[in-house]
Amino acid sequence: MDRIRIVGGNELNGIIPISGAKNAALPLMIASLLTSDTLTLENVPHLADVELLMRILGNHGVDVAVNGRRERQEDSYARTIHFTCRTIVDTTASYELVSKMRASFWVIGPLLAREGHCRVSLPGGCAIGTRPVDLFIEGLTALGATMEIDAGYINAKAPDGGLIGARYTFPKVSVGATHVLMMAATLARGTTVIGNAAREPEVVDLANCLNAMGAKISGAGTSTITIEGVTSLSGARHRVLPDRIETGTYAMAVAMAGGDVVLENTDVALLDTALETLRRAGADISATNNGMRVRRNGAGIKPVDIVTDPFPGFPTDLQAQFMALMTRSSGISHVTETIFENRFMHVQELARLGARISLSGQTAKIEGVERLRGAPVMATDLRASVSLVIAGLAAEGETTVSRVYHLDRGFERLEAKLTRCGAVVERISE
């Protein structure tokens, strides 16, 4: 099992190219099930989750072709991948594959819309809370589907003639459920109105792609999305938007380690709240032609309280990274997690590096320390794993992060991107 070794104490200086967003690429790939034509996606990151989803889609009949020549972006690679599903050959998504990645459960929407029936295993993925499927079931039921849970699977069936447009309001904001209901509604009869919809940029990106395929979607990016059903969708060519979570992660790494880094191929507008929070913590952030420049001013790291919220609030996927930054602040800060109920598993690992963090319910109190000291630590989930890397960049001595397969699910060539900016980071394969 691979480990990441970090020798702390080096500033970051240079250029880091930002990859395509994993959280956008996955639903876009799944949307290929909605058409018999070819969907071409550009700027697809090379990640474990992407590779796994390609296997899952292949089982359903999607032919996947990766361009032989990759678009070289310094130490990152933006791939162009063609997805063609002439015929859906299997409407069952097995436990063996779905249990490995929660997002693969989202095939339930396109399979139900195109074939009228499917059998999909209940999902797996990061162990950061229950993340129930109730919202998915209720939303699809509103479109006329019958849903039955049997032996760990959901058996879903559309009414004769296909799904029927309806008005449905989510009781709680859910990005995944918004993706699924929006995809399913594109082929439903009539008009669907989704209330309390997720407003994340990745939802907008999916809507833009679906519209390019012939869907009629309006309101994406607001809390009300309207979809006028069409009889079929065609192929399209679409570029995956930049990864705002990767962008924020590297910005926090610079704030933690110090230095001067330009983040290329990204957009400051994707994460206004997080960047404003970083500025309050002492980072100097300015927009460039195709990204941003991040520096840490001489005042050090200031304590800042945050509360995670759905977009446009502070992203839960940056919570662990920000907590790592606050361990070196000049005072006391608080991090409150409102999205997931079990997303503080990185706390005990940060404590191994010398962090002072106490928990009270869904709030963590962080007392900044003068220094962190390297130690062996263990990744518990995707975002927690990179928070340990960020802490290791500023820790004295050597930090080793084990179970980095979590890291490979969401960060493309992290060691290479940090190393080219002066960090001492290496992967140790065993």
Curated annotation (Swiss-Prot):
Catalysed reaction per UniProt?
A: phosphoenolpyruvate + UDP-N-acetyl-alpha-D-glucosamine = UDP-N-acetyl-3-O-(1-carboxyvinyl)-alpha-D-glucosamine + phosphate
Identify one Gene Ontology CC term for this UniProt entry: cytoplasm
Q: Which GO terms describe its molecular function?
A: UDP-N-acetylglucosamine 1-carboxyvinyltransferase activity
The answer on whether this UniProt entry bears the keyword Cytoplasm reads: yes
Superkingdom as given in the UniProt entry: Bacteria
Q: Per the record, a Pfam family? A: EPSP_synthase
| Keyword Cytoplasm belongs to the record | yes
Just give the chief location class. cytoplasm
What processes in GO biological process is this protein linked to?
cell division; cell wall organization; peptidoglycan biosynthetic process; regulation of cell shape; UDP-N-acetylgalactosamine biosynthetic process
**EC number of this enzyme:** 2.5.1.7
Q: Where is the active site?
A: 126 (proton donor)
Q: Where does UDP-N-acetyl-alpha-D-glucosamine bind?
A: 102, 131-135, 172-175, 317, 339
Membrane-crossing residues?
Answer: none
Q: Which UniProt keywords apply?
A: Cell cycle, Cell division, Cell shape, Cell wall biogenesis/degradation, Cytoplasm, Peptidoglycan synthesis, Pyruvate, Transferase
CDD domains under this entry? UdpNAET
Q: Where in the cell is it found?
A: Cytoplasm
Which InterPro entries does UniProt cross-reference here? Enolpyruvate_Tfrase_dom, Enolpyruvate_Tfrase_sf, MurA_subfamily, RNA3'P_cycl/enolpyr_Trfase_a/b, UDP_GlcNAc_COvinyl_MurA
What does this chain do? Cell wall formation. Adds enolpyruvyl to UDP-N-acetylglucosamine.
Q: Which HAMAP family match?
A: MurA (MF_00111)
Name under which the protein is recorded: UDP-N-acetylglucosamine 1-carboxyvinyltransferase
